[in-house]
Amino acid sequence: MNFKYIVAVSILIASAYARSEENDIQSLSQRDVLEEESLREIRGIGGALLSAAKVGLKGLAKGLAEHFANGKRTAEEREVMKRLEAAMRDLDSFEHPEEASEKETRGFNQEEKEKRIIGPVLGLVGSALGGLLKKIG
């Protein structure tokens, strides 16, 4: 008789353990889903900020290009213009989607372009604005 009780208690313990394992797996799955949703939201916000920055930089670059096109330019200003034009071409390439076969590498390529473009563009815009302010002042 004691053997039956031992077996019954063992089965109860095993089923309780199995249920706790299932609950742990479900809670981990729910956490993973929530983390993925959070990452998607963060990427969406980052993409929106990047789009706004691109539009602002493109407008600023076009304004600077028009300003520099109207007057005589020094060698330094010509170099700044060449860099701005290159940056504009790179920014335009962000807006044109690649073929479906290249979608997997697009995210990596876009991150590399962003790293390569945003730093120098901000430096160029700063130096161009500084030069413009020196001329005005």
Swiss-Prot record:
GO biological process: defense response to bacterium; killing of cells of another organism
Expressing tissues: Expressed by the skin glands.
Keyword Plastid: no
D-allo-isoleucine: residues carrying this PTM: 118
Gene Ontology cellular component annotations, sorted alphabetically: extracellular region
PTM annotation (Isoleucine amide): residues: 136
Span list, region Disordered: 91-112
Sequence positions bearing Asparagine amide: 70
UniProt keyword annotations, A-Z: Amidation, Amphibian defense peptide, Antibiotic, Antimicrobial, Cleavage on pair of basic residues, Cytolysis, D-amino acid, Hemolysis, Secreted, Signal
Alphabetized InterPro entries for the sequence: Bombinin
Annotated signal sequence range: 1-18
Location relative to the cell: Secreted
Top-level lineage group: Eukaryota
Purpose: Has antimicrobial activity, but no hemolytic activity. Preliminary evidence indicates that this peptide does not lyse and thus kill the bacteria by its antimicrobial activity.
Family statement: Belongs to the bombinin family.
Name of this chain's protein: Bombinin-like peptides 1
